[in-house]
Amino acid sequence: MDPNTVSSFQVDCFLWHVRKQVADQELGDAPFLDRLRRDQKSLRRRGSTLGLNIETATRVGKQIVERILKEESDEALKMTMASAPASRYLTDMTIEEMSRDWFMLMPKQKVAGPLCIRMDQAIMDKNIILKANFSVIFDRLETLILLRAFTEEGAIVGEISPLPSLPGHTNEDVKNAIGVLIGGLEWNDNTVRVSKTLQRFAWRSSNENGRPPLTPKQKRKMARTIRSKVRRNKMAD
């Protein structure tokens, strides 16, 4: 096993422990608490995959961090903080909307790069909006925390989430995953639009309805549908 993989996990465990102490003292805001819950699940999966005990890893991670802080000068810390670009955390969803469990009558799941796409194929003829919580840097989506598809009644019918086993994704990864989710939902005659926040930062080529432009495949499908309807109308006449 790569020693850097182990040490990274150990440090992540200790830093999560520190953040948990902050949350326990009620010093964390909603995005902070949201990331804390999601990172806990991710650490459990990583620990299981690596075969490492989280409690032991946390103690070793503490030793690594303490050694680094002991060697780090205040001036170097100031320079590091000053040179790091600041990211913003944007929220379309409340904590309740993000943490709510949901169920699918006809589940479909697809992995697109480092992202997992899930949708309920039983949903038909609904107006659906995509909402997401994510961070932005340099006016571009940096990290997707979670994206969910909601009906007008508030039911969750789809989701895009990062795969813990494949950390890191690009703005293009997110755009492609959104296209897959929209295509899957529209297959059952649902009308899908995205939130204004997503429309602004996830892609720049959406139309005024919050819809991404049709892909060539979607255009061909629409053309076939129109031709089929025209033929049926002629036969009826």
Swiss-Prot record:
<dbReference type="GO" id="GO:0030291">
    <property type="term" value="F:protein serine/threonine kinase inhibitor activity"/>
</dbReference>
<dbReference type="GO" id="GO:0039524">
    <property type="term" value="P:symbiont-mediated suppression of host mRNA processing"/>
</dbReference>
<keyword id="KW-1035">Host cytoplasm</keyword>
<keyword id="KW-1114">Inhibition of host interferon signaling pathway by virus</keyword>
<dbReference type="GO" id="GO:0039657">
    <property type="term" value="P:symbiont-mediated suppression of host gene expression"/>
</dbReference>
<dbReference type="GO" id="GO:0042025">
    <property type="term" value="C:host cell nucleus"/>
</dbReference>
<feature type="region of interest" description="PABPN1-binding">
    <location>
        <begin position="223"/>
        <end position="230"/>
    </location>
</feature>
<feature type="compositionally biased region" description="Basic residues">
    <location>
        <begin position="217"/>
        <end position="237"/>
    </location>
</feature>
<feature type="short sequence motif" description="Nuclear export signal">
    <location>
        <begin position="137"/>
        <end position="146"/>
    </location>
</feature>
<dbReference type="InterPro" id="IPR009068">
    <property type="entry name" value="uS15_NS1_RNA-bd_sf"/>
</dbReference>
<keyword id="KW-0832">Ubl conjugation</keyword>
<keyword id="KW-0922">Interferon antiviral system evasion</keyword>
<keyword id="KW-1088">Inhibition of host RIG-I by virus</keyword>
<keyword id="KW-1190">Host gene expression shutoff by virus</keyword>
<feature type="short sequence motif" description="Nuclear localization signal">
    <location>
        <begin position="34"/>
        <end position="38"/>
    </location>
</feature>
<dbReference type="Pfam" id="PF00600">
    <property type="entry name" value="Flu_NS1"/>
</dbReference>
<dbReference type="GO" id="GO:0039540">
    <property type="term" value="P:symbiont-mediated suppression of host cytoplasmic pattern recognition receptor signaling pathway via inhibition of RIG-I activity"/>
</dbReference>
<dbReference type="GO" id="GO:0003723">
    <property type="term" value="F:RNA binding"/>
</dbReference>
<keyword id="KW-1192">Host mRNA suppression by virus</keyword>
<keyword id="KW-0899">Viral immunoevasion</keyword>
<feature type="region of interest" description="Disordered">
    <location>
        <begin position="205"/>
        <end position="237"/>
    </location>
</feature>
<keyword id="KW-1048">Host nucleus</keyword>
<keyword id="KW-1262">Eukaryotic host gene expression shutoff by virus</keyword>
<keyword id="KW-1102">Inhibition of host PKR by virus</keyword>
<keyword id="KW-1113">Inhibition of host RLR pathway by virus</keyword>
<dbReference type="InterPro" id="IPR000256">
    <property type="entry name" value="NS1A"/>
</dbReference>
<keyword id="KW-1090">Inhibition of host innate immune response by virus</keyword>
<feature type="region of interest" description="RNA-binding and homodimerization">
    <location>
        <begin position="1"/>
        <end position="73"/>
    </location>
</feature>
<keyword id="KW-0945">Host-virus interaction</keyword>
<comment type="function">
    <text>Inhibits post-transcriptional processing of cellular pre-mRNA, by binding and inhibiting two cellular proteins that are required for the 3'-end processing of cellular pre-mRNAs: the 30 kDa cleavage and polyadenylation specificity factor/CPSF4 and the poly(A)-binding protein 2/PABPN1. In turn, unprocessed 3' end pre-mRNAs accumulate in the host nucleus and are no longer exported to the cytoplasm. Cellular protein synthesis is thereby shut off very early after virus infection.</text>
</comment>
<protein>
    <recommendedName>
        <fullName>Non-structural protein 1</fullName>
    </recommendedName>
</protein>
<dbReference type="InterPro" id="IPR038064">
    <property type="entry name" value="NS1A_effect_dom-like_sf"/>
</dbReference>
<comment type="similarity">
    <text>Belongs to the influenza A viruses NS1 family.</text>
</comment>
<dbReference type="GO" id="GO:0039502">
    <property type="term" value="P:symbiont-mediated suppression of host type I interferon-mediated signaling pathway"/>
</dbReference>
<dbReference type="InterPro" id="IPR004208">
    <property type="entry name" value="NS1"/>
</dbReference>
<feature type="region of interest" description="CPSF4-binding">
    <location>
        <begin position="180"/>
        <end position="215"/>
    </location>
</feature>
<keyword id="KW-0694">RNA-binding</keyword>
<keyword id="KW-1103">Inhibition of host pre-mRNA processing by virus</keyword>
<dbReference type="GO" id="GO:0039580">
    <property type="term" value="P:symbiont-mediated suppression of host PKR/eIFalpha signaling"/>
</dbReference>
<comment type="subunit">
    <text>Homodimer. Interacts with host TRIM25 (via coiled coil); this interaction specifically inhibits TRIM25 multimerization and TRIM25-mediated RIGI CARD ubiquitination. Interacts with human EIF2AK2/PKR, CPSF4, IVNS1ABP and PABPN1.</text>
</comment>
<dbReference type="GO" id="GO:0030430">
    <property type="term" value="C:host cell cytoplasm"/>
</dbReference>
